Amino acid sequence: MGIQPSPVLLASLGVGLFTLFGLALGTYLVRRSRRPQVTLQDPDEKYLLRLLDKTTVSHNTRRFRFALPTAHHILGLPVGKHVYLSARIDGSQVIRPYTPVTSDEDQGYVDLVIKVYLKGVHPKFSEGGKMSQYLDSLKIGDVVEFRGPSGLLSYAGKGNFNIQPNKKSPPELRVAKKLGMIAGGTGITPMLQLIRAILKVPEDPTQCFLLFANQTEKDIILREDLEELQAQYPIRFKLWFTLDYPPEDWTYSKGFVTADMIQEHLPAPAEDVLLLLCGPPPMVQLACHPNLDKLGYSQKMRFTY
């Protein structure tokens, strides 16, 4: 006859197993509760976010901070994507795309840096920017409709870009060791989003090269952020500026983006090179693309936001 375990031993084992199960379940629930919740659950839904703060960045640029549903929420925006803001303005529905300057490491809020185009300032746009003026008029506590994630490009890390040729096409993988960027004005925000995402990962070998065009020195938004990143990562990130109307002591380039600027400050055409463009249409269409054609950059090597 074999040895039978005593009822006391069986009871002890049962209590021990139950305790272990309870500890495991408790640990799981705690970790789950600490995991941040995502705000942008559905790209077709609109999410009402409340204005928390509005600060002046420069003479015509503001930083708008919006509250997420709770202090433990993140926006949930993949790197490379943007959001749409929509509002009823003067009887019409106005929708504009924006790339936040915060990331999913920031919980409880999202920041947008936006240039405000006022009425009567630019002769070609006498009415100014409808959405930017609307946002500038908001009071703390007002709400705005957000929708996203949106966009044809997303960054998967270590030089891997998923790019859709159009909205209906599946994404195609593009691998780049060198990332060249040409930005104009507020077109810097998607570039900064990518640069930060790449540089914060020591194992990401992607090199970043940025050519940033503006009209005047005071128009350069997020300059301190960019120069701080350049100083911190001098090998991985190269930064260059050009101004239409530079001051006398300006040490960077002058004028529109040229072929010489591209040759000198961006990576040469190659299979492992990707160029990203974001800025005013005249700059992109009249200054950038013709010069990229001239220098031998294929369409596959470019992406325009």
From Swiss-Prot:
PROSITE patterns, per database record = FAD_FR (PS51384)
Q: What stretches pass through the bilayer? A: 8-28
Instruction: Name any Gene Ontology BP term.
Output: sterol biosynthetic process
One GO MF term: FAD binding
| Domain annotation FAD-binding FR-type: ranges | 44-156
Enumerate the cofactors the protein uses: FAD
Enumerate the Pfam families for this protein.
FAD_binding_6, NAD_binding_1
Function, as annotated: NADH-cytochrome b5 reductases are involved in desaturation and elongation of fatty acids, cholesterol biosynthesis, drug metabolism, and, in erythrocyte, methemoglobin reduction.
In its UniProt entry, what is this protein called? NADH-cytochrome b5 reductase 1
Task: Tell me the gene name.
Answer: Cyb5r1
